[in-house]
């Protein structure tokens, strides 16, 4: 839940987020829609604990997000190649995450031999599957998907979104989905918020 979030990139400049509040239930898939530059990604970074708001607060079950250890709010980034350590094999990257079971890998179509490769050796769609697996650790309660499929072909997009809808429903994980595509949000989300 976010309460009265205010954020500006520079003091005295127009705020990117001006007293934004929202809440997401554990079974909801909430779409965030808005043009470029309206603060969608900034809000998602704040909700996932990557960025601090100038004022306002983010909390889970009435408490602030943890400052260390595993965060139950996980973010999947737009550019998977920037989210993975290029010096680790993808198998090593998965081991850094929170208990990823093989069924999750199978559901995402992750081939066992991909885990011996490095991020630069896989396609964007293959790499995004690893980013999703890392974000879906056993302790994840909320998932933030920030334009995660815009660079993918339509078949891969469909596979990934269908998997995410099934997995988040099965595990009662709340999901925030950022997209410029209203059609995508209409298909995936239970409700939408326009910034």
Where are the predicted features?
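Conserved structural motif at the start of ABC-family nucleotide-binding domains
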Residues: 16-17
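The feature captures the beta-strand-to-loop junction immediately N-terminal to the Walker
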Residues: 33-35
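Helix-to-loop junction immediately C-terminal to a conserved catalytic motif
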Residues: 48
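Conserved ABC transporter NBD signature motif
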Residues: 56-69, 100
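Q-loop/switch helix immediately C-terminal to the Walker
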Residues: 79, 86-101
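Conserved ABC ATPase signature
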Residues: 118-122, 126
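Hydrophobic anchor residue at the start of the ABC signature
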Residues: 132, 144, 160
């Amino acid at each position: 839940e976010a309460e009265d979030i205010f954020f500006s990139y520079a003091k005295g400049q127009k705020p990117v987020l001006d007293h934004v509040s929202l809440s997401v239930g554990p079974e909801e898939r909430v779409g965030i829609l808005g043009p470029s530059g309206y603060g969608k990604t900034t809000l998602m970074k704040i909700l996932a604990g990557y960025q601090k708001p100038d004022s306002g607060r983010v909390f889970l079950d009435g408490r602030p997000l943890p400052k260390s250890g595993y965060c139950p709010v996980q973010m999947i980034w737009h550019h998977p190649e920037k989210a993975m350590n290029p010096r680790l094999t993808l198998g090593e990257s998965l081991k850094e995450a929170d208990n990823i079971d093989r069924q999750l890998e199978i559901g995402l179509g992750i081939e066992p031999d991909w885990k011996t490769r490095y991020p630069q050796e896989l396609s964007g769609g293959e790499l995004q599957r690893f980013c999703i697996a890392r974000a879906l650790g056993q302790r994840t309660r909320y998932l933030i998907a920030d334009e995660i499929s815009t660079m993918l072909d339509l078949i891969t997009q469909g596979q990934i979104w269908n998997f995410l809808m099934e997995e988040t429903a099965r595990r009662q994980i709340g999901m925030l989905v950022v997209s410029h595509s209203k059609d995508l949000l209409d298909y995936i989300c239970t409700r939408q918020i326009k910034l």
